[in-house]
Amino acid sequence: AGHKVADLAAQIAGVQGAALAEKDLALVMIGMNDILELYASYPATGRDALLAEARTRGAAFGAQVNQLALRGPAVVVLTVPDLGLTPFALAQNTSTGDATRSALISALVAAFNNRMSVALINDGRLIGLVYADIEVQNNVKFAASFGLANVVAAACRADAPLPGCTSATLVDTATASTWLWADALRLSPAGQSRLGLLA
């Protein structure tokens, strides 16, 4: 399993070399695995309880980012992309027979991101916030304007999962520059590039 908010403090503490200071830049993006963990417990755990836990984890993330920023480095934090728009989420609508699954995932992401963002120190100096969720939503809604030909399917072939996927192992018609998703959950180089422009 991938890292979650609860693992962030140890990751920061494990940074090699001198302590992070005011001449350093820390880029922080975490939360996808928290959202997936919460979603996996549905419907055994109800929607309201899951949303409450997403908010709790978002607040914890915001608090950790604040602690990092107060230690000296400039911090750029990215919200969790809207996972409700991923190929994974769209497939969940079909495989579960419940067409509201992707909307639930989007709601969990929104609850997490909203609580995280309001927890951040907002003085315009310590922390920069990149709205990855809104960027993904815009890319899906206005795909042609962003030069995207496909925003619903994964570009990587199933037999060439990340990180082994390359431009030679894409599904037919896919390109790294015109498909939004690399796999069922992760952005392609095109999607990552757009986040980089925002940061």
Predicted regions mapped to residue ranges:
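Structural recognition of the beta-strand scaffold that forms the well-ordered cores
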Residues: 24-30, 34-37, 69, 74-79, ...
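Solvent-exposed loop/turn segments at secondary-structure junctions
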Residues: 1-5, 31-37, 81-85, 134-137, ...
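Extracellular/periplasmic catalytic domains that process cell-envelope and extracellular macromolecules
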Residues: 17-22, 26, 68-70, 121-122, ...
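Conserved SGNH/GDSL esterase-like catalytic core that processes O-acyl groups on lipids
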Residues: 1-63
